[in-house]
């Protein structure tokens, strides 16, 4: 995998004007995705980004991704395929998976990373039967099966660690837009954050101005 798949991905990306385009997915897979019926349970992008899908394995993998920038390749195969169950449009699901990977992963936008996510939607693969309601003919990797192959308690301990390995107590002075953004980011990364602000309302002075009649 280190030799063959890496070189395969490098050549694939080199040969494409738009390596992350949906048109790179093989025709049989696109046809299979188009034949899917309704029934997926859509979650918002922010819920998925913050690891709030409700799926124990997926949420742990996503938390590790945005806190540490890493995800084991075998887990990423399962992580990437799960997006298909949260979007009616498989193309949208693939681009959302690529966006998350590109934004948070240390190897985001790397050829192996791009091809790895697209593999989840049929790239470099063949059709499988029987047809699945969610994945169609594309290879399945359900999280409820994968979770039985690993020590989930140990995996969660690894991925839930705060960035830099230790949770710090951090104070942010100023509850304006920048202060709240910094506090939210540090909290997402596993640190204990306290915000101090002299204002009477959350959000600092930029959140609104009161007029004489009390409206904002």
Locate predicted features:
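Gly/Thr-rich phosphate-binding loop signature of adenosyl cofactor/nucleotide-binding cores
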Residues: 1-71, 136
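Glycine-rich FAD pyrophosphate-binding loop
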Residues: 171-173, 187-212
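C-terminal, helix-dominated tail/subdomain
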Residues: 22-38, 43-48, 93-157
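Glycine-rich Rossmann-fold phosphate-binding loop(s) that bind the pyrophosphate
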Residues: 174-178
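A short, basic/flexible loop-to-alpha-helix module at the beginning of a structural domain
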Residues: 163-168
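Structured ligand/cofactor/substrate-binding pocket environments in proteins
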Residues: 3-10, 66-115
């Amino acid at each position: 995998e280190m030799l063959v798949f890496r070189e395969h991905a490098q050549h694939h990306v080199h040969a494409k004007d738009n390596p992350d385009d949906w048109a790179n997915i093989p025709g049989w897979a696109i046809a299979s995705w188009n034949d899917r019926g309704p029934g997926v349970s859509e979650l918002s992008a922010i819920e998925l980004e913050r690891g709030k899908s409700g799926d124990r394995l997926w949420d742990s993998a996503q938390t590790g991704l945005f806190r540490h920038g890493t995800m084991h390749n075998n887990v990423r195969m399962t992580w990437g395929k799960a997006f298909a169950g949260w979007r009616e449009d498989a193309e949208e699901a693939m681009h959302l998976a690529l966006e998350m990977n590109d934004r948070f992963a240390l190897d985001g936008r790397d050829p192996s990373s791009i091809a790895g996510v697209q593999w989840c939607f049929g790239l470099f693969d063949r059709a499988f039967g029987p047809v699945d309601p969610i994945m169609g003919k594309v290879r399945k990797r359900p999280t409820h099966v994968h979770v039985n192959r690993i020590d989930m308690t140990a995996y969660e301990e690894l991925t839930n660690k705060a960035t830099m390995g230790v949770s710090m107590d951090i104070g942010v002075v100023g509850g304006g837009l920048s202060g709240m953004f910094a506090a939210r980011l540090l909290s997402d990364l596993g640190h204990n954050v306290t915000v101090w602000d002299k204002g009477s309302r959350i959000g600092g002075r930029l959140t609104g101005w009161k007029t004489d009649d009390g409206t904002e």
